[in-house]
Curated annotation (Swiss-Prot):
Protein role: RuBisCO catalyzes two reactions: the carboxylation of D-ribulose 1,5-bisphosphate, the primary event in carbon dioxide fixation, as well as the oxidative fragmentation of the pentose substrate in the photorespiration process. Both reactions occur simultaneously and in competition at the same active site.
Classification of source organism: Eukaryota, Viridiplantae, Streptophyta, Embryophyta, Tracheophyta
NCBIfam families: PRK04208.1
Family: Belongs to the RuBisCO large chain family. Type I subfamily.
The protein's name in its UniProt record: Ribulose bisphosphate carboxylase large chain
Modified residues (N6-carboxylysine): K201
Length: 485
């Protein structure tokens, strides 16, 4: 009999139901460096105290169940249980609280995002005592980070592979996203790449449909890449979407891409799943392929402010599972993204060490212990007038991706690509000369139109296009104080 069992045997077994807070609410607990820490936004049902709600989250996402069980005596709950160690009210909300929960590291399988999420965001999200529950942030301890390989290559290795430095990379999603034949699709890629873009991209729902089978698409896109490289003298790429119905088929597509000699492939990591994504990331690392990640389905999980998982958590999970790029919103385009929140998880994707900063929605200090960084991808409803803001917001280590903002150019794809490249080069040069992109951005673009007719035409087409809707996911503030200001 183990010492743990001997300790428990003397306590005896008392059947029945008891409040979670008696066991799992421990405000005196001092967190350990090896604990996984979670910040949950908890909305209890009427009549449920916040301490009980927080304790229920800790219990149901670790060792607890709805009643006392005799097998509790066969292990040490003090060693393995999750602990709610803090509760704080959410400013401006009547019945929402941030519950802080600490999990012992031994609860989780090494190198498995799948297992981590199965525990922390599993059945507890359907718990009846909670009206709503949202995972706002995680602190991943360095001991656990070191069990993950992370991105296949990372930012610096990608720049070295592409031989491109000192500016954001430029991309384009081929449109229409569905319906083109493989040959016409490849032609669209070629026109964009020869015009000055670094990458073109499969849309997230392009897999292997009757109108364009994956092998045909891969062949014609590879032809486009090599032809554009020969003409421009620059390394080019196309995000070949390897996402498939099975992991075996996904890896078969990745192998074919490697045999073609292309530099990068793509995966839809949420619809494809973390197990598939980690497997694909390992293959890319071993075979010299960059891996672009699309976040299709993320808004189902992260858009509601009081329920689900915040994207900063999904971004951390992707950095652990593996990917060299990930879509991160634009702040200025057609998709959801509040500026400070977006900058917060962009830092979490790129930097080695990120301090706690609630003004950016970061609840915990995170040390990635040299895990490679991920390039954020700004994509969705952006065009040349957005270039100064995008360059200022995202900086050099990013990918700026213009789909309609390239292919919608009145003169065609190649002139659309030229317009974007000229606008980017103008913004980077102006920034390097000390000009303020935030205040002088429109003037910088207008100056560049004087020597680029392609840019002038693009500016004329999109001069009235704006996406002015309030973000759903915003930082918490005291609403009463805001009204008085």
């Amino acid at each position: 009999m183990s010492p743990q069992t001997e300790t428990k045997a003397s306590v005896g077994f008392k059947a029945g139901v008891k409040d979670y807070k008696l066991t799992y609410y421990t405000p005196e607990y001092e967190t350990k460096d090896t604990d996984i820490l979670a910040a949950f936004r908890v909305t209890p049902q009427p009549g449920v105290p916040p301490e009980e709600a927080g304790a229920a989250v800790a219990a149901e996402s670790s060792t607890g169940t709805w009643t006392t069980v005799w097998t509790d005596g066969l292990t040490s709950l003090d060693r393995y249980k999750g602990r709610c160690y803090g509760i704080e009210p959410v400013p401006g909300e009547d019945n929402q609280y941030i519950a802080y929960v600490a999990y012992p590291l031994d609860l989780f399988e090494e190198g498995s995002v799948t297992n981590m999420f199965t525990s922390i965001v599993g059945n507890v999200f359907g718990f009846k005592a909670l009206r709503a529950l949202r995972l706002e942030d995680l602190r991943i301890p360095t001991a656990y980070v070191k069990t993950f390989a992370g991105p296949p290559h990372g930012i610096q290795v990608e720049r070295d592979k592409l031989n491109k430095y000192g500016r954001p990379l430029l991309g384009c999603t081929i449109k229409p996203k569905l319906g083109l034949s493989a040959k016409n699709y490849g032609r669209a890629c070629y026109e964009c790449l020869r015009g000055g873009l670094d990458f073109t991209k499969d849309d997230e729902n392009v897999n292997s449909q009757p109108f364009m089978r994956w092998r045909d698409r891969f062949l014609f896109c590879a032809e486009a890449i090599y032809k554009a490289q020969a003409e421009t003298g620059e390394i080019k790429g196309h995000y070949l979407n390897a996402t498939a119905g099975t992991c075996e088929e996904m890896l078969k597509r990745a192998v074919f891409a490697r045999e073609l000699g292309v530099p990068i492939i793509m995966h839809d990591y949420l619809t494809g799943g973390f197990t598939a994504n980690t497997s694909l990331s390992h293959y890319c690392r071993d075979n010299g392929l960059l891996l672009h990640i699309h976040r299709a389905m993320h808004a189902v999980i992260d858009r509601q402010k009081n329920h689900g998982i915040h994207f900063r958590v999904l971004a951390k999970a992707l950095r652990m599972s593996g990917g060299d790029h990930i879509h991160s919103g634009t702040v200025v385009g057609k998709l959801e993204g509040e500026r400070e929140i977006t900058l917060g998880f962009v830092d979490l994707l790129r930097d080695d060490f990120i301090e706690k900063d609630r003004s950016r929605g970061i609840y915990f200090t995170q040390d990635w212990v040299s895990l490679p960084g991920v390039l954020p991808v700004a994509s969705g409803g952006i065009h040349v007038w957005h270039m100064p803001a995008l360059t200022e917001i995202f900086g050099d280590d990013s990918v700026l991706q213009f789909g309609g903002g390239t292919l919608g150019h009145p003169w065609g794809n190649a002139p659309g690509a030229v317009a974007n490249r000229v606008a980017l080069e103008a913004c980077v040069q102006a920034r390097n000369e000390g000009r303020d992109l935030a205040t002088e951005g429109n003037e910088i673009i207008r100056e560049a139109t004087k020597w680029s007719p392609e840019l002038a035409a693009a500016c004329e087409v999109w001069k009235e296009i704006k996406f002015e809707f309030q973000a759903m996911d915003t930082l918490d503030t005291d609403k009463d104080k805001d009204k008085k200001r």
